[in-house]
Amino acid sequence: MQKIAIITDSSCDLTIDEIKDYNLNILPLKIIYKDREYNDIFDIKPIDVYENLHNEVPTTSLCSPDYINSVLDKLEAEGYTHLIGIFISSSLSGTFNAARLVIEERSSFKYYLFDSKIIGYPLGSIVIKAAEFVKEGKSFEEIIEALSIIREATTGFYTLNTLEYLRRGGRIGKVAGTVGDLLHLKPIISVDEHGAYTTIAKARGRKQSLKKLASIILEHLDEGKCNVAILNGMAEEEANQVLDSISSHPNLLKSQVRAIGAAMGVHAGPGMVGVSIQKEI
């Protein structure tokens, strides 16, 4: 009999309650200050990062091999036979490869590792769907086969108050930097086919960028039924405004407003508003 574990990283931006409810195993990114470090999700909250930005902008790093091994030891002791790992885009983080190197050395599990080529709650929504399939009793092979379909149905878009934090983290990629700030152009950011950040649209000023974000959501809803999560980093009021502007669409299934996690907050900075869209599967 298959006993399947789902493992992911903390960039999925799931809550502690969701992690418990879906029996997920999390590899936390590290949030590092000059004199201290924290495990994302478990040891630090986004508000802690934002309130300290004027003193110090932290960095993030990968979960350690020792921590990954401790998670695997626990799963082995609990009798898990199969492992499905669903991780942040390998173009944005070394987490996928770090996990792969450790898991490949273990003979206890039959495993499958999936590079989501996405980040944040869009990743989290893929993880939740996979965990639901585990609860439903689907087989290891069925879930693996479904992952590409779930990923194809899932997308995310973001707009930031400033690109400063994305630049500091070295993850700005194809996203236009200095010119955008100088001209008050706000890029709408997504990921390309390789899972790297890219600009898919620009708007002049904050108000127009939020309108553009809403119009992108409506375009997806026009194509079919979707679950939508509006994401924010210390911008809940604006996130609710975006949700209000799309809430009457007949193809909107479930909708919610969610806060991004601490590690995401390090790179997005305060004021990020985004969206996770998942087509009906």
UniProtKB/Swiss-Prot annotation:
One GO molecular-function entry: lipid binding
Domain of life: Bacteria
Alphabetical keyword list: Lipid-binding
Annotated Pfam families: DegV
Annotated hexadecanoate binding sites: T60, S93
Transmembrane intervals: none
Task performed by this protein: May bind long-chain fatty acids, such as palmitate, and may play a role in lipid transport or fatty acid metabolism.
Taxonomy of the source species: Bacteria, Bacillati, Bacillota, Clostridia, Eubacteriales
Domain DegV, chain residue ranges per copy: 4-279
The name this protein goes by in its record: DegV domain-containing protein CPE2509
PANTHER family referenced in this protein's UniProt entry, alphabetically: DEGV DOMAIN-CONTAINING PROTEIN DR_1986-RELATED, DEGV DOMAIN-CONTAINING PROTEIN YITS
InterPro entries reported in the protein's UniProt record: DegV, DegV_C, DegV_domain_contain
